[in-house]
Every structure is written in structure tokens, then in C-alpha cells.
């Protein structure tokens, strides 16, 4: 059997598909890649905030819905908006490091004033503005290679990226991992997900064999927070869960650049209940501080 996998045509996306494909090969399943151009690819110089929701996912998911592919593979942080009701999560791979990193000559505490840090994430911008208001941020688009090239050419004095991206690309840049209390990661950062059609029971059963349950539980808890509070790649909300045994450890943060709220939770339970509880805590604190998301 050969499974058709739809994904963006970028280098990082291809690596992510191959990571999942290797898991399939180990259980005797072959795969082929269907390259898809997304809105984010077609408008690669536009700020993400101007492109709306689903810019990394819509066209890829449509290929599955239209029967051109069997599975859509994404960085799970890119699909925080509601998934099409005809699709569902078939599997996730074991999570890579979920952290944000700073690529710069100095660590965050020692950065000079009035330098420019490249990031297109409103979450990262606001967290940085809260911690270091004297530092400037500037939108940066393009793949990781392009961003690093701009940094090395001194167009930016630093970059904030996802650590998982560098790991998957096998890049050896020196970087500083950012504290999760200062830079709580985007929900589902570091997770690769496979979506399929709900009706495809045969393929669904295959993907159960490669699913990493603890990672999926962490992802679902984080998504419950985002669903309750409202968020995604255009929102300044960070949330991270770690599951150890039956225990969930979670942290969620929100910042408008002037104020910052962080809440946490530690208890056993199911992902949806724990995530919803953390989301309610965050909403309550946001209301107390007169912050409207």
C-alpha cells in the first residue's frame, strides 16, 4: 500500500514528511509526496497578520478533502484554527523541543538597546517588548535559511525562531534557548501532525501504529486553552504542557507588550479538562488586568 501525503513544498516541510514517512516504512507502508502551494507561499513577502487564518494549511487540507491525497502533514502549530469537520487528527510524532530560541551574538539579558530583532510572530514581539522595551522588532518572512541569511548579512541583529526548525534542518547555528516563563511557546510548537478524512477507517488504523500518545495529549490540552481563550499564530498567547505519567504540567501566558500574565497548572486528568481549566485561569487573570484578547 502507498499513502499519498500532501504538504507544502518547502525544505522544512519535506523533511517533516520524510520524518513521518520513515515511521510508516517501519510498519511496511510506502508513501509519496504531493507538493502543494499555499497562500503563505504565494504571498511570501506579506506579513502573516495580513493573510488571515489558515495560510499554511488550507490548500494542503483541500487536497485531502478532494481526494488528491490521503493525508495532510503540518507543523501542528500552524493548524490552531478549527480543523475542517470532515478531517481529524490521525497521528502526531514524538514532540521535538518546543522552545523559542534567540539567534544573536549575546543572550537576551545582555542584548544592546535599539537593535532590531527579526520575527513575524505577534506573540514573540509582545513578549520581547514586555521584557526588553528598548529593543526593536521587524517582520521577517521566508524559510529558515532565508532568515538566517538576512541575519548574517546584518539586516537584523538577532532572530527569534522555533528550536524544532533548526533541529529538523540539522543546522548548527549557535543560539540561546529562551525561558518558557519569558517566552511561553506557541501551542503545539515542535509537533508534526497527520490529518486524514474521518471516513478513511483503514488509513486511520494504520496511523494509530505510529501515533505518540503523550505528545497528542499535550497537544490536545494546549488546543483546549487556545479554543477557550482564542488564539493562533496571530495571537499573543503562549501555552505549553508536559505530560509525565498521568500528570500534566502546564503554563499559559498572554502579553499586549505592556502587561504580561502567566498562569500554571499541575494535576492529573484528561487533556481537554486540564487544558480548559488552564484556559479559564488565563481568562480570569486577563479580565482582572483589563486585557481583552
Curated annotation (Swiss-Prot):
The record's listing under InterPro entries reads: HemC, Porphobilin_deaminase_cofac_BS, Porphobilin_deaminase_N, Porphobilinogen_deaminase_C, Porphobilinogen_deaminase_C_sf
Q: Which GO terms describe its cellular component?
A: cytoplasm
Extract the SUPFAM superfamilies matched here. Answer: Periplasmic binding protein-like II, Porphobilinogen deaminase (hydroxymethylbilane synthase), C-terminal domain
Q: Is this entry keyworded Iron?
A: no
Q: What biological function has been recorded for the protein in this entry?
A: Tetrapolymerization of the monopyrrole PBG into the hydroxymethylbilane pre-uroporphyrinogen in several discrete steps.
What biological-process terms (Gene Ontology) are attached? Answer: protoporphyrinogen IX biosynthetic process
What protein name does the entry list?
A: Probable porphobilinogen deaminase
- Bound how, and how many: what does the cofactor note say? Binds 1 dipyrromethane group covalently.
**Protein's pathway:** Porphyrin-containing compound metabolism; protoporphyrin-IX biosynthesis; coproporphyrinogen-III from 5-aminolevulinate: step 2/4
Region forming the signal peptide: none
Q: Which organism is the protein's source?
A: Saccharolobus islandicus (strain Y.N.15.51 / Yellowstone #2) (Sulfolobus islandicus)
Q: Which reactions are catalysed by this chain?
A: 4 porphobilinogen + H2O = hydroxymethylbilane + 4 NH4(+)
- Name the cofactor(s) required for activity, per the record: dipyrromethane
Q: What terms describe the molecular function in GO for this protein?
A: hydroxymethylbilane synthase activity
One Pfam match, given by its short name, reads Porphobil_deamC
User: Enzyme class, one word?
Assistant: transferase
**Misc. remarks from the entry:** The porphobilinogen subunits are added to the dipyrromethane group.
Q: Which residues carry this modification: S-(dipyrrolylmethanemethyl)cysteine?
A: 233
Source species, domain of life: Archaea
As for family, the record states: Belongs to the HMBS family.
Q: Keywords, A to Z?
A: Porphyrin biosynthesis, Transferase
Record-listed E.C. numbers: 2.5.1.61
Amino acid at each position: 500500500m502507498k499513502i499519498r501525503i500532501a504538504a507544502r513544498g518547502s525544505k522544512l516541510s519535506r523533511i517533516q514528511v520524510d520524518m513521518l514517512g520513515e515511521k510508516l516504512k517501519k510498519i511496511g507502508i510506502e508513501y509519496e509526496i504531493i507538493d502543494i502551494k499555499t497562500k503563505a507561499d504565494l504571498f511570501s513577502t506579506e506579513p502573516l497578520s495580513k493573510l488571515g487564518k489558515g495560510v499554511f494549511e488550507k490548500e494542503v487540507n483541500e487536497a485531502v478533502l478532494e481526494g488528491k491525497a490521503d493525508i495532510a502533514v503540518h507543523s501542528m502549530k500552524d493548524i490552531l484554527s478549527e480543523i475542517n469537520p470532515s478531517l481529524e487528527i490521525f497521528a502526531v510524532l514524538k514532540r521535538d523541543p518546543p522552545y523559542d530560541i534567540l539567534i544573536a551574538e549575546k543572550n537576551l539579558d545582555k542584548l544592546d538597546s535599539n537593535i532590531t530583532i527579526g520575527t513575524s510572530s505577534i506573540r514573540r514581539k509582545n513578549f520581547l517588548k514586555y521584557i526588553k522595551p528598548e529593543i526593536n522588532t521587524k517582520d521577517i518572512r521566508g524559510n529558515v535559511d532565508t532568515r538566517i541569511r538576512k541575519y548574517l548579512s546584518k539586516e537584523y541583529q538577532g532572530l527569534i525562531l522555533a528550536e524544532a526548525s533548526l533541529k529538523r534542518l540539522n543546522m548548527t547555528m549557535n543560539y540561546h534557548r529562551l525561558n518558557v516563563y519569558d517566552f511561553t511557546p506557541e501551542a503545539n510548537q515542535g509537533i508534526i501532525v497527520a490529518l486524514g478524512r474521518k471516513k478513511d477507517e483503514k488509513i486511520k488504523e494504520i496511523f494509530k501504529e505510529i501515533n505518540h500518545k503523550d505528545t497528542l495529549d499535550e497537544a490536545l490540552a494546549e488546543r483546549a486553552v487556545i479554543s477557550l481563550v482564542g488564539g493562533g499564530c496571530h495571537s499573543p498567547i503562549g501555552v505549553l504542557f508536559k505530560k509525565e505519567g498521568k500528570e500534566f504540567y502546564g503554563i499559559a501566558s498572554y502579553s499586549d507588550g505592556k502587561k504580561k500574565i502567566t498562569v500554571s497548572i499541575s494535576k492529573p486528568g484528561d487533556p481537554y479538562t486540564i487544558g480548559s481549566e488552564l484556559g479559564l485561569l488565563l481568562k480570569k487573570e486577563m479580565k482582572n488586568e483589563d486585557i481583552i484578547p
